[in-house]
Curated annotation (Swiss-Prot):
Pfam family, one: tRNA-synt_2c
Cofactor note: Binds 1 zinc ion per subunit.
Biological role stated in the UniProt entry: Catalyzes the attachment of alanine to tRNA(Ala) in a two-step reaction: alanine is first activated by ATP to form Ala-AMP and then transferred to the acceptor end of tRNA(Ala). Also edits incorrectly charged Ser-tRNA(Ala) and Gly-tRNA(Ala) via its editing domain.
The organism's taxonomic lineage, starting at the top: Bacteria, Bacillati, Bacillota, Bacilli, Lactobacillales
Protein residues bound to Zn(2+): 568, 572, 670, 674
The protein's name in its UniProt record: Alanine--tRNA ligase
């Protein structure tokens, strides 16, 4: 068998199929771009759906790829079995109506066994086929030459997920020998395709030749397809003679680096530690690539998966004796292993590390307390009759300590316990309900949904000119009912065509007027929203009666529309500038386009520096002043992506999309309204940059007249400050302020020195009144001071005065009670503790406090009780002495 690295195996696979006329397709992002049904890309074929369903015709009907994939449905098995992973690579070759069984089966055999390629021992290869698939059997036996006892017929070898394309499949297995098995040689599961560790599945070839009809019948597909998948990690484990995937060159460098970070732990020393090493190695691969592709930790969706993986890895780091954040330190190792085919981890290494480290540090704050609570919860559950961790306890771990439910479930399972999932879900539901009530009842179109869903009439939004549009009124909704005439106060209208933009994609709706054919104002448009069937709904205040079927003149508020166009184009410029300054890992996380300002949310872990903000603003304004034409193209999503358009994560695109291009600086999918040229924006001014959540920042900016107003307002403020500080010109204001600040600091220093002298004099008076309480000397008094700081300063003076063994000082400040108690070593040796004394006294003046044995302080609401509190302390001093 050849000695090959994982990189060589990957490249060899792609080269083999390239030689057989295949187009090598780069791995798609782990984040699905055009499939809202998927959380992650989880296989090679997941990226081929558009070709197999006919929605897109590929340039080459033969395709091969090595696809990054994430699956977390069996996450609890990662580390405990030889093959389970959350992140893996799927090598695949695909035929879209081109070749079929007579080509793909011999190719698979050639790649696996030819000395030019992998050179595996043919005697160790077995295949499974569907019993009725005589063609596949013939190819394996008569053409390839596999003996009958190496071909297993299995009813399960039929790929079918319900309605749609389906067909038989053929799986290829490698015999690792009985010495690597986990069942006896005579076990009924000891065969290729059975539940055993001896026969390792390395390749699955699906022959998609039938169509499963709704009536349950199967008919031949006119165009037959091939879909294959070979797990890179599995085949590499065979090539490198590794007992599991984790002993290959894809994982071992990560495990070795983890050993260095651990408390002297070594891989292969004991089973429990090995599980932890494997989990860490797998999870750091998954999160590194997911973050490189644009995902960030959060409390929902794929962000929750990332958070769960990072925290699961950190928990296993604890088991290896690793203290604090550590997973981020393994990212460079991942990048080094994968860089030959996937440079993105190396390219974005600093950002990926920062994201992981931030998430780890957040978890570390509560990790220790959470683990202690988890141990206590498990101990209590073991004593219970039903051996179950309550849903309430599981939710507390989640809500207070950041432990995902799945981590609690795994810990409980390891301890032989169950978790009350229903109870957990009920707690979660109750919390969401509390949050909903706190937000209040938001207005929605929900009450109209039934009526609106039944409206099928077509309505077209017309981009472009803002001239008046003549349109027919085709539907009127009043009080959730369809009517033929509206003459009340409010109504919702649908026209056969409209120039009014409906709110979408962060851009708010157009406003305007509706006139009758005589030019009379009949209604004011106050909002426009999308109906369930995508018509534009015009919410109007009625002036004169409106009738269904009549022609009306629709007039958009041009000033408002201009503001919206300018600000929307500005958001595209801002997005591109942010990516240029902060890096291409920066993505849009939300936006709001209003006529008088814009708001843009973007992914970033840190606040922008003043220099970065200024640089972004400069780049945007340069593009505005370059007078660049804004080009809009209507096309299909695939063509748009090839044009370089940015697709927003989570957005679903239809068969046609609008691509907005600003030269080669910005290209985005966008359905909003835009300028014809960037110079129409005038200028942009960033008003603020702030945080809106973990990993998300927000910029608020103004353009055009609003930007001019913002600058002139600030100029007026500057002039007022200039007059106030008596600067001769605006450029001198900062120097003048610095000079005034210096004078102020000098004056404050003088005042503090004078105050210290006064306090010292007060201390002299106070410290002369010394009482003898049994074997200790005591100074106890109420002082005339301005605050607790003054009391503490008096106590500091007392320490160096050697006037007494005990100091009790009290003061009333702004209607509040304050007390300080200090003890010297003699008083402490006599059995006194300042913290205990203050806790006895504080309730008397309506407060609480604490401190160290030699110094304590307290505050309260009832200064009238200070005299009695001092007396109580003196009593305690007398009684508590040894």
């Amino acid at each position: 068998m050849k000695q090959l690295t994982s990189s060589q195996v990957r490249q060899m696979f792609l080269d083999f199929f390239k030689e057989h006329g295949h187009m090598v397709m780069p791995s798609a992002s782990l984040i699905p771009q055009d499939d809202p049904t998927l959380l992650w890309i989880n296989s090679g074929v997941a990226t081929m759906k558009k070709y197999f369903d006919g929605s897109v015709v590929p340039k080459n009907h033969r395709i091969t790829s090595s696809q990054k994939s994430i699956r977390t449905n069996d996450i609890e098995n990662v580390g405990k079995t030889a093959r389970h992973q959350t992140f893996f690579e799927m090598l695949g070759n695909f035929s879209v109506g081109d070749y079929f069984k007579k080509e793909v089966i011999p190719w698979a055999w050639e790649f696996l066994t030819s000395p030019k390629w992998l050179g595996l021992d043919p005697d160790k290869l077995y295949v499974t086929v569907y019993p009725k698939d005589t063609e596949a059997y013939h190819m394996w036996h008569d053409v390839v030459g596999l003996p009958e006892d190496h071909i297993v017929k299995l009813e399960d070898n039929f790929w079918d997920i319900g309605e749609g394309p389906c067909g038989p499949d053929s799986e290829i297995f490698y015999d690792r020998g009985q010495e690597n098995n986990d069942v006896a040689e005579d076990d009924p599961e000891n065969f290729p395709g059975g539940e055993n560790a001896r026969y390792l599945e390395i390749w699955n070839i699906v022959f998609s030749q039938f169509n499963h009809l709704p009536n349950g019948k199967y008919v031949d597909q006119p165009h037959k397809n091939i879909d294959t998948g070979m797990g890179l990690e599995r085949v590499v484990s065979i090539i490198q003679d590794a007992p599991t995937n984790f002993e290959t060159d894809l994982f071992m460098p990560i495990i070795k680096e983890t050993e260095k970070l651990s408390d002297g732990k070594k891989y292969a020393a004991n089973k429990e530690d090995d599980v932890a090493f494997k989990i860490i190695a797998d999870h750091v691969r998954a999160v590194s690539f997911a973050i490189a592709d644009g995902a960030l930790p959060s409390n929902s969706g794929r962000g929750y998966v990332l958070r769960r993986l990072i925290r699961r890895a950190d928990l296993n780091g604890q088991r290896l004796g690793i203290k604090g954040a550590f997973l981020y330190k393994l990212v460079p190792v991942v990048g080094e292993i994968m860089k030959s085919h996937y440079p993105e981890v190396v390219d974005q290494q600093a950002f990926i590390q920062k994201v992981i480290k931030n998430e780890e540090e957040r978890f570390q704050v509560t990790l220790s307390s959470g683990l202690n609570l988890l141990d206590n919860i498990i101990a209590e559950a073991k004593k219970s009759d039903d051996k179950t961790v309550s849903g309430k306890d599981a939710f507390k771990l989640f809500d207070t300590y950041g432990f995902p439910y799945e981590l609690t479930f795994e810990a409980a399972q390891d301890a032989g316990l169950k978790v009350d999932k229903k109870g957990f879900d009920e707690e979660m539901k109750a919390q969401k309900e509390r949050a909903r009530k706190a937000r209040g009842n938001l207005q929605s179109m929900g009450s109209q949904d039934v009526t609106l869903m039944n409206i099928k009439d077509k309505s077209e939004f017309e981009y472009g000119t803002l001239e008046e549009k003549h349109a027919k009124l085709i539907d009127i909704v009043v009080n959730d009912k369809l009517v033929d005439k509206a003459d009340g106060e409010h109504a919702t209208l649908i026209f056969d065509k409209t120039p009014f933009y409906a709110e979408r994609g962060g851009q708010v709706a157009d406003h305007g007027e509706i006139l009758n054919q005589n030019g009379e104002l009949v209604a004011r448009v106050t909002d426009v929203q999308h109906a369930p069937n995508d018509q534009n709904l015009h919410f109007v205040d009625i002036i004169l009666p409106l009738e269904k079927g009549q022609e009306y003149i629709l007039k958009v508020d041009q000033k408002r529309r201009r503001g919206l166009k300018h600000n929307h184009t500005a958001t595209h410029l801002l997005h591109a500038a942010l990516r240029e300054v902060l890096g291409t890992h920066t993505h849009q996380a939300g936006s709001l386009v209003e006529p008088d300002y814009l708001r843009f949310d973007f992914t970033s872990l840190e606040p922008m520096t003043k220099k970065e903000i200024a640089n972004v603003e400069k780049i945007v304004n340069e593009k505005i002043w370059e007078e660049i034409p804004v080009k809009t193209t209507v096309t299909d999503p695939d063509t748009g992506l090839k044009m370089g358009a940015l697709a927003l994560f989570g957005e679903k695109y239809g068969d046609t999309v609008r691509v907005v291009q600003i030269d080669d600086f910005s290209t985005e999918f966008c359905g909003g309204t835009h300028c014809e040229n960037t110079d129409q924006i005038g200028m942009l001014k960033i008003v603020s940059e702030s945080a809106v959540g973990a990993g998300t920042r927000r910029i608020i900016a103004v353009t055009g007249p609003e930007a001019y107003k913002y600058v002139t307002d600030r100029d007026e403020i500057l002039k007022e400050v200039q007059d106030e500080v008596k600067a001769t010109k605006a450029e001198d204001v900062t120097n003048k302020i610095s000079s005034l600040e210096e004078d102020l600091r000098a004056s404050q220093k003088e005042a503090e020195q004078l105050k210290a002298q006064i306090n010292k004099a007060k201390a002299g008076d106070l410290f002369n009144d010394v009482k003898q309480v049994k074997g200790l000397t005591v100074i106890a008094a109420q002082a005339d001071v301005e605050g607790m700081n003054d009391l503490r300063e008096l106590a500091d003076n007392w320490k160096s005065s050697d006037k007494s063994d005990v100091l009790v000082l009290a003061a009333e400040v702004n209607g509040k009670a304050n007390m300080v108690i200090s003890l010297n070593d003699k008083a402490i040796k006599a059995g006194l503790k300042a913290g205990d004394l203050i806790k006895t006294a504080a309730p008397i003046f309506g407060g609480g406090g604490g401190g160290r044995p030699n110094m304590a302080q307290a505050g309260g609401k009832n200064p009238a009780g200070l005299k009695d509190a001092i007396a109580k302390v003196l009593q305690e001093v007398e009684e508590k002495q040894n």
